[in-house]
Amino acid sequence: MPLFAIGLNHDSAPVAVRESLAFNAEALGDALQSARSETGADEVAILSTCNRTEIYIRLPHTDPEVVIGWLTRHQRVDLRKVRPHLYVRRSTEAMRHLMRVSAGLDSLVLGEPQILGQVKDAYHKAANAGCLGAVLERLFQHAFAVAKQVRTDTDIGSNPISVAFAAVTMAKQIFDDFPKRTAVLVGAGETIELVARHLGQQGIGQVLVANRNVERAKRLAEAHDGEAMSLNDLPRRLPEADVVVSSTGSSLPILGKGTVERAVRARRHKPMFMLDLAVPRDIEPEAGEMDDVYLYTVDDLRGVVAENMRSRQDAATQAEAIVEQQVRHYLEWRRARDAGEAIRSFRSRAESYARATRAQAARQLSRGEDPFEVIEWLTHTLTRRLVHAPTVGLRAAAATGDRTRIQHALETLAIDQQLVERSSEGDDSQQAGADGGAARGDRRAAGGS
């Protein structure tokens, strides 16, 4: 059964598309059962985070469109909307993908550790739903081993290197008394969540989260001991902000120059650090013309992030090598497992032949037939039955000139190649002798006539 990894992530799809395919954690068990029954899958696991939705699945066929069709139907999403953002990884690429994801090599933030916990959650949910078999079980264990080795043997997670971290670092350069400061975060997506996390780690005094969807703002605020509000409340609460970080998907500015100007006056011209991470921009660029406003965009942070990325390229290269090593180990296990299944099947067939032939021999003996002749019949019949299938395969390979297949068969059956060649030469000599004798006989017959 082929293995697939099917889904989308932060590189292939915007937040709006990712949200449409995200699975509710409480309903994931039912979704797993549905995926298994409707696609005919042998095994299935679903990884759903704010950055990605991925289905790892073993199918009895090679058509991933069945899974894509199930996914869009189950999530009630228009296939045309999400199809351009989906990727399909097959076999070895699917194995490699899960290992890279688990190690943080496919994350928005290179090497971020949170993804490993999310992969483990996906594994446990699939196991609890009875949707894991030997193949996915072993694959997840190899993925966990990769993540652990990458953490232990490389510096991939030594320092956070994200736009969010760079933003907070820059804010701290302006305010050295962070515990006394208030941050207003506009938006509630992954980037803002990372900003909130780093602000908390740096000891920010208070966090206010403004978002069009207040429920999402509440969830984010509660996770960081903050306060939520709607975008309509933002102008009224903006004067409280020492730090403003905005990242929404709005096509128009959220904060105009006039709103910022009124907030600065209400603050009695105390400095305000503003970072606009959105594209298109959330904050009118004219707001940065005021003396007390320090307005930056994501482009102003790229240098910091790129420098940190360069400093960790060696670690990333080491991590990729670890992934490749584990992919090889997993493939070795898969091949050994597949061979084991073939061996068990072959032995089962041989034992079935033996039982049937033995039963026939017993009936012959019960009829009083000569035991020696029965033994001769038994050995001849059993040998013929056991070698029939390999013989048919060898003849088919010989007929097509497939020498590689013949060589593999000889090695598998432990047949000496030199013995085969000597036997072939002997057959040729015998045939030549027979041809010569026939020719002499023809001459004798001609002379005697």
Swiss-Prot record:
One Pfam family hit: GlutR_N
Assigned EC number: 1.2.1.70
GO BP, sorted A to Z: protoporphyrinogen IX biosynthetic process from glutamate
Transmembrane feature ranges: none
UniProt-annotated binding residues for NADP(+): G187, A188, G189, E190, T191, I192
InterPro entries listed in its UniProt record: 4pyrrol_synth_GluRdtase (IPR000343), 4pyrrol_synth_GluRdtase_dimer (IPR015896), 4pyrrol_synth_GluRdtase_N (IPR015895), GluRdtase_CS (IPR018214), GluRdtase_dimer_dom_sf (IPR036453), GluRdtase_N_sf (IPR036343), NAD(P)-bd_dom_sf (IPR036291), Shikm_DH/Glu-tRNA_Rdtase (IPR006151)
Family matches, as Gene3D superfamilies: Glutamyl-tRNA reductase, N-terminal domain, NAD(P)-binding Rossmann-like Domain
Biased composition (Basic and acidic residues): 440-449
Active site: C50
Highest taxon of source: Bacteria
Chain positions of site Important for activity: H97
Ranges where the record places region Disordered: 418-449
Catalytically driven reaction(s): (S)-4-amino-5-oxopentanoate + tRNA(Glu) + NADP(+) = L-glutamyl-tRNA(Glu) + NADPH + H(+)
Residue sites binding substrate per the record: T49, C50, N51, R52, S107, E112, P113, Q114, Q118
Keywords: NADP, Oxidoreductase, Porphyrin biosynthesis
Pathway, per record: Porphyrin-containing compound metabolism; protoporphyrin-IX biosynthesis; 5-aminolevulinate from L-glutamyl-tRNA(Glu): step 1/2
Subunit organization: Homodimer.
Stated family: Belongs to the glutamyl-tRNA reductase family.
Note: During catalysis, the active site Cys acts as a nucleophile attacking the alpha-carbonyl group of tRNA-bound glutamate with the formation of a thioester intermediate between enzyme and glutamate, and the concomitant release of tRNA(Glu). The thioester intermediate is finally reduced by direct hydride transfer from NADPH, to form the product GSA.
Function: Catalyzes the NADPH-dependent reduction of glutamyl-tRNA(Glu) to glutamate 1-semialdehyde (GSA).
Annotated protein name in UniProt: Glutamyl-tRNA reductase
Annotated source species: Halorhodospira halophila (strain DSM 244 / SL1)
Upper classification of the organism: Bacteria, Pseudomonadati, Pseudomonadota, Gammaproteobacteria, Chromatiales
